[in-house]
Structures are given as structure tokens and as C-alpha cells.
Amino acid sequence: LPICLIPIAAPNPPLRSFAALLSPRAVTPETSPMTFARPKRINGRVPVLTAEEAVKYIPDESTLCVLGAGGGILEATKLIEALAERYKTTQTPKNIGIISPTGLGDRAERGISPIAQEGLVKWALCGHWGQSPRISELAEQNKIFAYNYPQGVLTQMLRASAAHQPGILSEIGLGTFVDPRNQGGKLNDITKEDLISLVNLEGKEYLYYKTVAPNVAFIRATTCDSEGYATFEDEVMYLDALVIAEAVHNNGGIVMMQVQKMVKKATLHPKAVRIPGYLVDIVVVDPAQTQLYGGAPVNRFISGDFTLDDSERVKIPLNQRKVVARRALYEMKKGAIGNVGVGIADGIGLVAREEGCDEDFVLTVETGPIGGITTQGVAFGANVNTRAILDMTAQFDFYHGGGLDVCYLSFAEVDQHGNVNVHKFNGKIMGTGGFIDISATSRKIVFCGTLTAGGLKTEVGEGSLRITQEGRVTKFVESLPEITFSGKVALERGLDVRYITERAVFTLKEDGLHLIEVAPGVDIERDVCSKMAFRPIIDENLKTMDPCLFTDAVMGFKLPDGE
């Protein structure tokens, strides 16, 4: 079932900004936009400032949209650090809002963690939170107002903001925690104002996501000319840099762009330019800017300039992670278009290469890459041998419209109704990322993970699996207080859902979660059912998982033909 995303034109711009809910200075239909001081252009040249000079133009109660993804991808680090230092030393600006569509950071102190300071930030609307845990901590401690839009919806909301549309209608998120009949995307106790509402249009339910208008942008490129026209030749991807710049510019704000170098006016190839100069108000040049955290200035394989020789198959160590990836590959067909998510699911592409079938299908990443060898870890998406790279917003358009045949996503918790939680668990806010966008429309959804967590140890080999130390954490729980994937909605849409672990495989049917496969060497009662908070339905066609999954040799797996 295709999922549509319908922009609705605003009758009278400017927009009603979310900041209006919290600040008397924000843009509303009845008030004027915030007025920004900005350095003037001289003879058309874009002002070039230090990062410290640039952030002085950010006023109290402004709404900052930050570009970037994990591992330092497109992160304007100098601007972020300068803003953090300005607040530490001057206690200004105060009470700003943060919009961050993609999770940037290193799951520790980088990303937007430096600006996660009480008093500096009043509210945040993010697609993903966990890459910058300091901002998550402010939300967990009820020190800021905190919202989560699905990553794809959020980037499309920014596009709507650029077009002065007050919101978007979408089926994405129905039945999940962003549905206002549940939590409405609110992440803590102090966040009360609704940004998402339920709408019935011609007999169908949609979620209406209010547009939140940004008025300050931190973006990054590789090179710009003296008028601000920018190219991304050393970058991993584009993300939604253009959408962010357009949204801030059209809402009367100020766009700050960090680059590695500047060149003479009109010397950049026009097809390489991704940001037109008239959108840029300030340029900050950082000659030491690197493509990713802690690496060389640029890796030409990651930037797509060089092709890695992948003719030699690299063997992956046999462990529980590989077992899950191998079994997940069985759900792929020739010619399929898939998405792979971060976590244990990201081993799919590596296993396919080992089996020699990686060219029989196309894997995509929501941030824009299409094809290639998927990277793992904090810089997920920094692929090599990529076939194409789209703007992130366009990638999500494709996903929302039902373009995916299959997706591979990791899970944190699953309940007896097939619902999945990844956004908030163990008291920590991780955020949804693109999970809701992807799982809402993919024709087949394959969730990947271990049956338990927290110290799980296994021995894999000779065609079987042995549990040597059971995990302390139960992942298959009776019920979920918050839902990131709705089993009920998936069944209503006719989607095919699998849950693959190292020792068992489940599928979702109308009467609940069915156990359909169990690993050789595993006892159903002792190792599976007793480790779940509910009893799964033992399928009448219960099978043993293919012993080849648990051997060190290449399986010789051949993909079945697509429909």
C-alpha cells in the first residue's frame, strides 16, 4: 500500500513556528519574523568569518537546524564548538531550539552534545537522539522540551517549511508512539504541546505534522567560491543540506556554512554545485576539516572518487551476528531493492558479498547512498563503491511511496503482538531515526537481533548453536509502553514481517507471533520460550534453521528469482 505525503499550502506566510509555543519572539501568523543582524556582502562576496565571530549572530530564542550524520559526516564542527564555548563564557544565546533530522555524533561527546547545555537549549525536535547522548540526557532529566518526528518526515517537514507550508499529511507513524492517540512524539513528562494531530480525509486516517520553521542553519560543504556557491566533492553524502538552507533562508533566517577551502568566483562546475550562493549568509573556513572523525582529510574511496577492488571475497568470522545476517539474507530475492539499518542488520551486505550474490539486488541507506559496500558502526552510511547518492529527502520520498521490497532493521524489544520498540528503552532516549519511515511501507520487514541481550555468549560451528552464557536482558516482552513499529498496522497493510535471532525465527500473523524456525542444538522450551516474557505460538510447520548457517564454510546460497 503506497503511503502518501501531501504538502498543504499555507494561505498566509510566515509560518507558525514551534518556537511560538515556547517563545513570544517566534514567528506566528499574527506576528512578524525575528529580525536577524547579519554581515553585509561587499561586491557580492559572501562574508567570511571565524566560527567565534559567526555564532555571535545567533540571538536568544532562535531555532537552529543542524546538518550532519554519525561519525562526523557533514558536521560543521567548528560552528558547533564555537556556539558551545560562547554560551559557557557569556551565557548567550539563551533558550534556543534545536532541529536535527539525522543523528550526528559519536555516541559520546561529539555531534550536538557540546551544545546540550541547560539554559542554552530550551527545546529539541530530532529524528535521532542517541548519537549525541548529552542532548538525550537533558530530555531524560526533563530539562528541555523534547520531540521526535520520524527522520524522513522531519526532512520533508523542512522542505515544507521552505515552501511556507504549515504542515504535511502522512500515513507514516500511524499506530506508533508519534500517533497522538499514543505519545504524539513527545519524549518526556514536561512536553505537553501537541505538534502532531490525527486527520480523517476522504475516509482515511493521516497524521498531520506541524511545520517547525528554523531560522539559523549550521551546514557544511567541501568548497565554496567567493559568492558562497558550494560543492561537496570530499563529502560522504549530501543529506538534506539544500533543504535546510532553503528553509532557513525563506524564513528570514541566517545560514552559516563551514567549508574546507574557498576558490575564485564562478570557477566551480555548475553540476557540482549543491548550494547556491544566495542562500549563504556566512562562511567559516576550516582548512583542517576532515571527512570523518579522526581520519585523514579525505578518503577517496568513501568520497566515491576511487573504486575499491572487491574481487576478492573477504570471509567474515563465524559468530551469532553472522548467523543472523545469513538467515536474513534468505529473505532477499533477485532484483529486489532493500534498505539496511544500523546495528546487527548491517551485516547483510557483507554476507551477500561472501556468498557472491551481492550484485543480484540493491541495498540503500536512508541518508542517500545506493549500492556499494555498507560500512558498520558510528559512521554508518559512509559506503564505498556506491552506485549513486541521492539527497536524503528524495530517498525518503521513494521509501514513503512503497519503493522498498525489503528492509533489514535491528530491534531492541518485541512484544507478543509483534510491536517493536527501538526509540526509548532502559530509561534512555535513542529516537526513531528512519525506522518508522522505512518499516511503514516496505513490503517485507525483517527485524534482526539476538533473543536476549546483556552478556549473551554463544558457540557457533559444525552446523549448530550452543548457548554458553545467557543474556541478562529479556528482549521479547509481554507488552510495550511505547511502540516504534505497529504489528497491527503492518497486518492491516498486508506486510510480511519476520523477526530473526541467532536461535529462532518468528513471523507475524493475525493471532500473534509464530515461532517458525529454531536453531539446531537449541531446545525450544529451555532456550527459546523460557527466555521470552510471553509464549509464542508454535507454528504447525515449525522447521529447523538451515545447518549451513552455523558452519564456517561459504554456504553456496543462491537468491531465488523475484516476482
Q: Where are the regions that the model predicts?
A:
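Glycine-rich adenosyl-nucleotide cofactor-binding module
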Residues: I302-A328
